[in-house]
A protein has these predicted regions:
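N-terminal cap/lid segment of alpha/beta-hydrolase-fold proteins
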Residues: 49-99
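Short beta-strand element of the alpha/beta-hydrolase
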Residues: 90-93, 101-110, 130
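Cap/lid segment of the alpha/beta-hydrolase catalytic domain
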Residues: 121-196, 248-260
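Primarily recognizes the serine-hydrolase "nucleophile elbow" in alpha/beta-hydrolase
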Residues: 200-265
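Short beta-strand/loop motif that positions the catalytic acidic residue
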Residues: 287, 293-295
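Catalytic histidine neighborhood in serine/cysteine hydrolases
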Residues: 314-330
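Surface beta-strand/loop "capping" patches
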Residues: 345-388, 400-414, 465-473, 508
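Extracellular ligand-binding interfaces
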Residues: 475, 486-570, 576, 583-610
Length: 611
């Protein structure tokens, strides 16, 4: 009896604590799962009971800026209540200063970014209302301390993303910790789930604003924001979406050829649960609105093949892809302008006459493949380029420009097929705009649409075969075709993936030779080499080389592998170089020379790998 009497108080305390926890959870947006049997095992079940309109937003207007054209408000609103604490998001809400309802969209920034007032002002001048959500909580205004506060949950992948991050290390899995919703493995413990909840609440915010036409709402985002776009695209309130450099599915699938580090599967103890509830591949089949993927041909996050694998899951044909070639994570003006056109067409119902995805064919006969493309609206067509590669690593492959033949309205390319190597091919079609368009940071009179990417992938891929292909590229670069094999971020420096071209002799007994004519100027040459995103064992890191050059005639600069500096004391290996970036600075003005134009090629004339 004494033992029973001693037990009763403990039972009472446990009961009181249990009731307290239930009351606490009852106020939460989501009641935590306690048993594995409660955990949803597919995306429909995961979201079926969530109503993004149910809880009041409790909007606060922190500050307003007003001009004759645009009104911008710094606002915060409630995402939800998690672990008994409110999570609130800061954002810029911008709209045209006209008394009418406007088409609108949510913009979700990337993992290294923040919301931008200027972006909202630009799009307001284009006739859109926008909500630019600051989901990472980085500072926005020097005189405003109020910002995003996630309370007791942490939706970030690591402390470097968010100043108020509660975790001290990376987290990508579905396991529970002190800052997740559920105490057991659950898709709601993924950072993406919380970010998608915030995105849906952002749509609710737009719905409730008198300046917004709630029937004309879209969603767009960059990088991590592109993934948020993909997860939010299944919301029936969304009329069109534009994921930038993010949003692809199949991130858990390694590239062919056992390329180490090409997937995120190693992060998951519950890989099947991630596949069925969080990976974008289970969202795209449920998306019914028009989709525009904007990316780069060598994007590390939105990898090239995964874009097309994701779009193949759509149950409608209303999609486009636009990428800039030889670039990573950096769409150019010819891609950015399509955001304006896409939302004009599908949110404002303005007919922009965007061409269909250029029709293409791909046929294999023995050791040869034939690719054809027949772009539509050829009266507006400026250029058609065909690119191919045998390298399964889409992050670092060099896209080779194919020789094409034109017959009437069709371009064709004959490509060799090699045993135990994949082959990838697509066309890039450049179109003229009706008039030049001023973008937020640039302007353009053309835009680009990709064809479908075609490929053959053997069951067994042997990357060693790449090294045995004929070495037909005798000159690294002579600029006879301009910077066709290069890209640029600043319209000054140029970057290429050409060290990954299998038709180039990259033997380590070679030296890098540059022919440069300073034209009487005092110049500083800088070359940056990187191995990032190659298969993990081949990632040597970063290398740099600088040299001063002057004179009035052409001279040859010969650089040995040992001349490049590396923080870890490593030596360059030519086959293990992913990117090569070249910058030349005028030391008198400290301005970079423009290496994208003919004038720059009068100075930087030729690049070779020599004995």
């Amino acid at each position: 009896m004494k033992e029973l009497n001693r037990t009763v108080p403990f039972l009472r305390i446990a009961l009181i604590w249990h009731v307290f926890v239930l009351q606490l959870c009852a106020a939460d947006t989501f009641i935590p799962f306690q048993e594995a049997s409660e955990v949803p095992d597919d995306v429909v079940e995961l979201w079926q009971d969530y109503d993004a309109r149910r809880e009041p937003l409790e909007v606060q207007i922190i500050k307003e800026w007003k001009t004759d054209d645009v009104i911008t408000r710094y606002v915060t609103f409630k995402v939800g209540t998690f672990k008994g604490s409110d999570a609130r998001l800061a954002a810029y809400f911008s709209f045209p200063n006209h008394p009418q309802k406007h088409a609108a969209f949510v913009w979700s920034h990337g993992g290294g970014q923040r919301a931008q007032k200027e972006r909202g002002i630009y799009f307001a001048k284009q006739g859109f209302a926008t909500l630019d959500i600051n989901w990472l909580g980085r500072p926005l205004e020097a005189d405003i301390q109020v910002n995003t506060d996630w309370g007791k949950v942490d939706p970030t992948q690591g402390p470097q993303f968010y100043s108020k991050a509660l975790r001290k290390s990376w987290k990508r899995n579905l396991q529970p910790d002190d800052y997740s919703i559920d105490p057991i493995a659950s898709p709601r413990n993924a950072n993406w789930f919380l970010l998608a909840v915030a995105a849906r609440r952002a749509i609710t915010f737009l719905e409730e604003q008198p300046e917004v036409d709630r029937e004309r709402i879209g969603f767009a985002g960059y990088s991590m924001g592109g993934m948020i776009t993909a997860l939010t695209a299944i919301d029936s309130r969304v009329r069109a979406v534009v994921p930038f450099v993010g949003g692809t599915g199949f991130k858990y699938v390694d590239f062919p050829g056992r390329i180490e580090g090409s997937s995120i599967r190693q992060h998951f103890r519950n890989l099947e649960l991630y596949q069925s509830t969080i990976d974008a591949s289970v969202y795209w089949p449920l998306v019914t609105c028009p989709v525009l993927f904007i990316s780069s041909s060598n994007d590390f996050h939105s990898t090239f093949e995964r874009i097309y694998q994701s779009l193949a899951l759509l149950r409608h044909p209303n999609w486009r892809v636009s990428t800039n070639v030889h670039q990573n994570h950096g769409p150019g003006p010819e891609q950015w302008v399509l955001l304006n056109l896409w939302f004009n067409q599908y949110l404002k119902d303005i007919e922009e006459d965007i061409p269909e995805t250029p029709p293409s064919t791909f046929k294999i006969s023995g050791n040869s493949a034939t690719f054809t493309v027949t772009p539509g609206q050829q009266e507006r067509l400026v250029d058609t380029e065909v690119y191919y590669s045998y390298d399964p690593n889409s992050r670092t492959r060099f896209w080779i420009s194919a020789d094409t033949k034109r017959s009437a309205s069709t371009w064709s390319a004959e490509l060799p097929v090699h045993e135990r190597l994949p082959l990838y091919v697509f066309a890039l079609c450049r179109y003229q705009l009706r008039k030049s368009v001023q973008l937020q940071h640039d302007h353009t009179s053309t835009f680009v649409l990709n064809s479908l990417e075609h490929s053959i992938i053997p069951k067994s891929v042997d990357l060693n075969v790449l090294a045995t292909l004929p070495k037909t590229r005798t000159v690294f670069e002579d600029f006879d075709d301009g910077i066709q094999d290069w890209s640029t971020r600043d319209n000054r420096s140029i970057k290429t993936y050409k060290f990954q071209s299998p038709d180039l002799d990259r033997s380590n007994d070679k030296k890098l030779s540059l022919t440069i004519n300073p034209l009487g100027k005092k110049l500083r040459l800088r070359i940056n080499l990187e191995s990032q995103f190659l298969s993990r064992p081949n990632n040597l890191g970063k290398f740099s080389y600088t040299r001063e050059i002057n004179g009035n005639k052409a001279q040859t600069v010969v650089i040995d592998r040992d001349d490049f500096k590396n923080a870890d004391g490593k030596t360059v290996e030519w086959p293990k170089i992913a990117t090569c970036e070249i910058t030349i600075v005028d030391q008198e003005t400290q301005a970079k020379l423009d290496l994208t134009q003919t004038a720059g090629h009068e100075i930087l004339r030729k690049i070779e790998l020599i004995d």
